[in-house]
A protein has these predicted regions:
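Conserved HGGG/HGGXW glycine-rich cap/lid loop of the alpha/beta-hydrolase fold
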Residues: 1-40
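Conserved acidic catalytic loop of the alpha/beta-hydrolase fold
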Residues: 49-66
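Gly/Ala-rich beta-loop-alpha elbow adjacent to hydrolase catalytic centers
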Residues: 71, 75, 79
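Flexible "cap/lid" loop of the alpha/beta hydrolase fold
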Residues: 80, 84, 90-124
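Conserved alpha/beta-hydrolase catalytic His-Asp/Glu region
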Residues: 104-106, 124-182
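Short alpha-helix in the alpha/beta-hydrolase fold that links the catalytic acid
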Residues: 177, 186, 200-209
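Short beta-strand/loop motif that positions the catalytic acidic residue
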Residues: 184, 190-192, 196
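Catalytic histidine-centered segment of alpha/beta-hydrolase-like enzymes
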Residues: 222-235
Length: 260
């Protein structure tokens, strides 16, 4: 599980009940270098350096095991890199509002829209918290705020600004992951938000064409934190993705391989 930039593993912890319900998956939630409790050394100066740190983590902690990877936003770009690096060892790829076009000026983005504003809620919050919440919230509500407070805000208050600044200054990967591999046959789930004004959804639809076994869902009333905006729909899609991978790895199934 790989989170996005400026947050930490807690952004994705709300998905854990869905993943745990099947009872067969060990979940590993990373804190990327410079975020959460992971320190970024001076060598972390680009997205490529972060990607290599994640590759090293997989090699050191998973050995030769097969694994699935789910990446959100910046973590989606890193998840794609893992597919390019490990190939058939990756059982499935989950992309949650992933970065597809690294250069912001080249992204196809919808206009910024707030579908439901709650000025009373914002006025009740700490001003800094209200600003961070309002930047991404598509539907402002008490429940939506509480999910943001518990999942996103801790990481936003903890990241190493110097380290993240170095990464952001060298943001694109040197080689697009899909240019490194000819094909990937595992189940791919791509979830985008219709109102995601950070990475958009149109570039994500174009990326889906690079994967032969890809399920795409553009969630309505969802922005860049689509899993916080639409937790029920996100959970159902993730459950289906897990089911697809479990079907493949059953004994006798075509392409079955060792369970994680």
């Amino acid at each position: 599980m790989i989170h996005g930039l400026c947050v930490d593993h807690r952004l994705l912890l709300g998905l854990d009940p869905v993943l745990a319900a099947r009872g067969t998956w060990r979940r590993i939630y990373l804190d990327l270098p410079g975020m959460g409790r992971s320190v970024a050394g001076p060598q972390i100066r680009s997205s490529d350096a972060v990607a290599e740190a994640v590759v090293d983590f997989v090699r050191e902690n998973l050995g030769g095991q097969h694994f699935a990877v789910l990446g959100n936003s910046f973590g989606g770009m890193l998840a794609r890199h893992l597919v390019a690096e490990f190939g058939h060892r990756v059982m499935g790829l989950g992309l949650l509002c992933p970065v597809v076009v690294a250069e912001k000026s080249r992204r196809t983005l919808p206009p910024r829209r707030i579908l439901h504003a709650d000025p009373h809620l914002l006025a009740s919050l700490d001003p800094a918290d209200a600003t961070d919440y309002a930047e991404l919230a598509v539907i402002q509500s008490r429940g939506n705020w509480e999910r943001f407070r518990d999942c996103a805000l801790p990481g936003l208050r903890a990241f190493d600004r110097r380290a993240v600044g170095r990464i952001a200054g060298n943001y694109p990967l040197a080689v697009e992951p899909e240019d490194r591999v000819s094909s990937f046959g595992g189940p791919v789930l791509l979830i985008a938000g219709r109102q995601d004004h950070v990475v958009g959804f149109e570039d994500q639809l174009a990326l889906a064409g690079r994967y032969g076994n890809c399920t795409v869902s553009v969630l309505e009333e969802a922005g860049h934190n689509a899993h916080l905006d639409q937790p029920g729909q996100t959970g159902a899609l993730l459950d289906g993705w897990l089911a697809d991978m479990e079907d493949i790895r059953r004994p006798g199934a075509a392409g079955a391989h060792r369970a994680p």
